Amino acid sequence: MMRRIAVAIVAATAAVQAAAPPDLDGWVARSMQTFNVPGLALAIVKDDAVVAAKGYGVRKLGETTPVDENTLFGIASNTKAFTATALGLLVEEHKLEWDAPVVRYLPAFAMWDPFVTRELTVRDLLVHRSGLGLGAGDLLWWPASTYNRKEIAQRLRYIQPATSFRSAYAYDNVLYLVAGEVIETVSGQTWEDFVSTRILARVGMTGSNVRHSAAAAGGNVAAPHAPIDGKVRPIAPFDSDNTNPAGGINSSARDMAKWLRVQLSGGVLPDGSRLFSAATARELMTIVTPIPVNDPPPELAPLKPNFNGYALGFGIRDYRGHKLALHTGGLPGYVSRVVLVPELKLGVAVLTNQESGAAFDSIAFRIVDHYLDVKPFDWIDGFRKVQERSDAAARDAERRASAQRDTASKPSLPLAKYAGTYRDAWYGDIVIDLANSAERGKLVMKFSHSPSLVGDLEHWQHDTFIARWRDRELRADAYVAFALNPDGSIDQVKMSAVSPATDFSFDFQDLLLKPIAANSTKH
């Protein structure tokens, strides 16, 4: 009898320890209200049990259809762990090696530096230490472009590095596209087919899919939202599939709970079979690229780490004495967070249909704190203060730029002299036209491979204009600065984002545009 009582007490204690925070629903509601999030999906796994897999809010503002456990959200860069896992499966099958050069599998692959071309490995594709700058090359696919995956990979040889090889961390997306090409070449399947059949199907993620374009197909899908001119509203989904290996998966709370379980179990599936080996599990969560440790804002003091780095598709850091494997994901209208605490067998996934990292982190860290049994911290208030300060800093930067503007200055040349075709070595051609009289003789900039990058050039000062993109959902207006030769002809054009809040994937600053002759071959 006493033994049965003891067992019952242990079981009851374990159940209490595994239970979600008692204030979870209220906390989520407060976070969503504070950060203007219409809909959210949440998955919590503890000790190989699904504690929560549920939806909150609505799929689309202005409609009443609720988010449920099966509602799909774009998980964006949380896809990277799937791509890394796919490569791990091929390593286990002896079809490739982590530390073999990429050119062994893709002989035509090349980077700017021949040394890097020769030495860059499969592992290097995943860990953000190639020497490319932050978001380098993203304009090849963001916003949606006409380049296909192979063409994007081929253009990497024209992107100059920002640092020396393996010397610094700088987040990129384009090398995950190359990883997708490696998977296709080695396996004989497209990245999409490989991940669908070899990972999603085996894990039981039957509701998920692997294409950006699928999110636009309708069904039980959360609509993307973003603040446009100060008001959150639905926006058009990102529907280009050329970057699926870096961020193309759409998933739900129900399916993400299954993914968390597999990762926390070191690759073991619920039926006892393995998706991947213990060796692959160690590879996925072992730091390769160190990341400098910086103090967080004072409002978020508990986030201070002792170590930080990037593994294979996961960031790795410590939090309150425990190792975390985590990642974020961001697309137009969707952001997400995955957090794994392997020592606690705890996993959290937060998927949202609004671009508020403050929302997903205020929820994720509240849940982690609960299972660590530490004093509650008001993450919502902390992230709110940091976000407000960041927003204010961005506005102040734009005000300072406006105050320093020389409003009396005029362009050095007649507007027609700025018109023409300009070429960047890695992006290709950009055309500047003098618009017709109906548009009052304004210059219009058009990116040849990015249909939505069409902008009216407003004179700013001297020979600098601002490209006001006609698609206002981009939120990425850019300075366009013309440099002249002594004879008054145009030597080159440089660009940069107007607002410091512009997404880093609009890597305008990496473009070096040179005028080309009218009879040059189009790029």
For each predicted feature, which ranges?
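Residues that line or immediately flank small-molecule/substrate-binding pockets and catalytic motifs
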Residues: 9, 44, 109, 129, ...
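Generic structural signal for secondary-structure transition and capping sites
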Residues: 37, 130-134, 160-161, 204-208, ...
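Short secondary-structure junction motifs
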Residues: 37-39, 51, 97-99, 117, ...
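Catalytic loop of the DD-peptidase/beta-lactamase superfamily, centered on the K-T-G motif
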Residues: 19-54, 141, 184-197, 201, ...
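Hydrophobic h-region of N-terminal signal peptides that target proteins for export
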Residues: 8-18
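Bacterial N-terminal signal peptides that target proteins for export
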Residues: 1-6
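An acidic site on a long C-lobe helix of protein kinase domains
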Residues: 121, 175, 252-255
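Active-site-proximal loop and beta-strand segments within enzyme catalytic domains
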Residues: 58-173, 180, 187-189, 197, ...
